[in-house]
Amino acid sequence: MAEPPSPVHCVAAAAPTATVSEKEPFGKLQLSSRDPPGSLSAKKVRTEEKKAPRRVNGEGGSGGNSRQLQPPAAPSPQSYGSPASWSFAPLSAAPSPSSSRSSFSFSAGTAVPSSASASLSQPVPRKLLVPPTLLHAQPHHLLLPAAAAAASANAKSRRPKEKREKERRRHGLGGAREAGGASREENGEVKPLPRDKIKDKIKERDKEKEREKKKHKVMNEIKKENGEVKILLKSGKEKPKTNIEDLQIKKVKKKKKKKHKENEKRKRPKMYSKSIQTICSGLLTDVEDQAAKGILNDNIKDYVGKNLDTKNYDSKIPENSEFPFVSLKEPRVQNNLKRLDTLEFKQLIHIEHQPNGGASVIHAYSNELSHLSPMEMERFAEEFVGLVFSENENSAAFYVMGIVHGAATYLPDFLDYFSFNFPNSPVKMEILGKKDIETTTMSNFHAQVKRTYSHGTYRAGPMRQISLVGAVDEEVGDYFPEFLDMLEESPFLKCTLPWGTLSSLKLQSRKDSDDGPIMWVRPGEQMIPVADMPKSPFKRKRTTNEIKNLQYLPRTSEPREMLFEDRTRAHADHIGQGFERQTTAAVGVLKAVHCGEWPDQPRITKDVICFHAEDFLEVVQRMQLDLHEPPLSQCVQWVDDAKLNQLRREGIRYARIQLYDNDIYFIPRNVVHQFKTVSAVCSLAWHIRLKLYHSEEDTSQNTATHETGTSSDSTSSVLGPHTDNMICAVSKASLDSVFSDKLHSKYELQQIKHEPIASVRIKEEPVNVNIPEKTTALNNMDGKNVKAKLDHVQFAEFKIDMDSKFENSNKDLKEELCPGNLSLVDTRQHSSAHSNQDKKDDDILC
């Protein structure tokens, strides 16, 4: 409630020319007689952020009626709590001692003193009184000089204090005083501040602090996951930045909520994302990287060839060497490049390291090799092929592919050659737009190709593969010895054919090859109009109703053209079946289809993606390869740029390669590759079982003589005649850590080798055979007494010394080797599991 008008106001106005007699204590307001307290309080309330709900003193028109004399009334208690003292310094008209000491004080709860009531009888001039509401708006010329000076001095003393209080409230410096009940004086009146608003401000500050803490925690967690550590400052200057950070936090949270569709299907976590980010960021030192890898040794295993000195290949990493990039997956090209220093023809070998994929490819160019003599060309071929197929200590090739550009120029056009020399040879060709296959002759297929050929592609179905070493069962093809002789004229192909000098097979005839060569023709990927497609399944008749409603039919209701995809999805070349299936190397020759057009430059025929051999298992897992399927159906998805980038982020290395006309290419084992035919091409390809891949199985052996007989099994002609009587011996083995992976891959049966039988025994008596020590990669066994009869095989006794690490594999092997009767499932695969460099030393009793 507002207090009643007090006669003190009239006392303050009674002395118009008074001077200030005393100074109030620090913090008190000095008022002139011309300035009623009601007007001052009204002015104060407007300037102070409107804290008080209502004014305590001088409300309404009390300032204007201050000159009216009213008897003092008992004041009501203040609405804001405890009473506070009022103090005035009235101005006197003359410097008399009574007027100089006329300052008085009284509390809000006491009556007016008698001395004050006596002074109330003095008349008040009307011209000196100004309405309180217009006092602050009066011009200075209307006031007396003394009053104007006093008002200006009073205003000057009041403004700095208001500014200080506003600054305290703004910066929060006066919060503690306000919360503790400290009051501010106004017009000589004690006016406490509202507590509920102070509490609200304190709560808002606490909430802001908690929000900042939460933001810091969230940002720190996000940056720790991203490998960044950044401390945010809490100063007031960075408040506008917090809005941007809030948006970033929301974006990151939204990205986390979104899951990749492929990850939702597989529900497999990323295995390499965090480790690759950490190491690729350069946070690990070179020493830590070596310890983490555990792969990089001082010596690098080199290819063992006839003309290569392996002693010169022991390249060690210098201790003070600095590598600009350290990664768990990246190969250090410096080590591989040092291997070229000891090569005879290193200036003719070009190594391409692809920065996007991280894998390396070896190139050689026939125009640079033209000055070599035939003997030098043979040495270069062995050196180049040995470098392409060389492997590290993990049996993974250093390079994903080796290419000799233009090396097949001496060969004739394959399609022209076979259509002219073997016109009636049957072939199988596909029909464009259909999955049907029709059988035709080589000359008829060549005629279709020639009729539809234009600028690098033809519009006829592709020709399926035919065998060049004889057809078996449902295969198509024949034996073409003259063409095979032309292939052997190349030093690169002579050593890498299935029966070549680097092969572990010793074939009596080229017809016995189960690894090719094969030949096929592809038209190239293209868009084909529907009208040009024979018997197109997309073509349909329009009914009468459709003809009437043509205006409503969209133009895309019928396909105008169709994409013919000429692609071979990702696969790895394998030999063998079942548990004996294992990866092997591949060789290919490309001859573009020209049909009389001979361009000056070789045409691009294939786009190839090859993955590094060391990432074989990861590629199989990521791309869901079924390695027991044929090459065309091992993978169900096509690897495009987006998939390549995803795999690269997970540390998988690859190379993107373009193959040209007349190129010969070599692909090491465990290299997953996919091909896309970009122009019409005739291809040759075959598998090669290198001695390098089976060199650890070659040991010197003593043979036991057996009786020979004839065999009706045509598939075993590689090994020679077989009979029903066999004597099988299990060799004594020493453990080799290099082939421990074969134990886990169930390749135990590959170590049982089958050889031709020397003689046939007529007696049915058991024969005791003493077998010396031999080295394989399975386990330690002593074959002491082996009993054999004409129709079955019996093992008398075994003494097995097992290592605890290979106990399970030995048990499985014993069950497979000792069933009482030994059945040979695939003799061709067994023969391929070893090399026969010295036939006498390699004979095994089977």
Swiss-Prot record:
Stretch list, region Disordered: 15-124, 145-222, 242-272, 697-719, 827-846
N-acetylalanine, modified sites: 2
Residue spans of biased composition, Basic and acidic residues class: 183-211, 836-846
Disulfide-bond pairs as recorded: none
Low complexity composition-biased segments: 66-108, 145-155
Record key words, sorted: Acetylation, Dioxygenase, Iron, Isopeptide bond, Metal-binding, Nucleus, Oxidoreductase, Phosphoprotein, Ubl conjugation
Biased composition range(s): Polar residues: 112-122, 700-718
InterPro entries: RSBN1/Dpy-21 (IPR026306)
Source organism, top-level taxon: Eukaryota
EC number, UniProt record: 1.14.11.-
Co-factor: note: Binds 1 Fe(2+) ion per subunit.
Modified residues (Phosphoserine): 6, 32, 315
Cross-link Glycyl lysine isopeptide (Lys-Gly) (interchain with G-Cter in SUMO2), where in sequence: 223, 548, 753, 763, 814
Binding positions for 2-oxoglutarate per the UniProt entry: 568, 665
Places the protein is found: Nucleus
GO molecular function, one term: metal ion binding
GO cellular component: nucleus
Modification type N6-acetyllysine: residues: 28
Broad class of enzyme this protein falls into: oxidoreductase
Positions that bind Fe cation: 571, 573, 673
Cofactor section: Fe(2+)
Main location: nucleus
Annotated family: Belongs to the round spermatid basic protein 1 family.
Function: Lysine-specific demethylase that specifically demethylates methylated lysine residues of proteins.
Name of the protein described by the UniProt record: Lysine-specific demethylase RSBN1L
Organism (species): Homo sapiens
Gene: RSBN1L
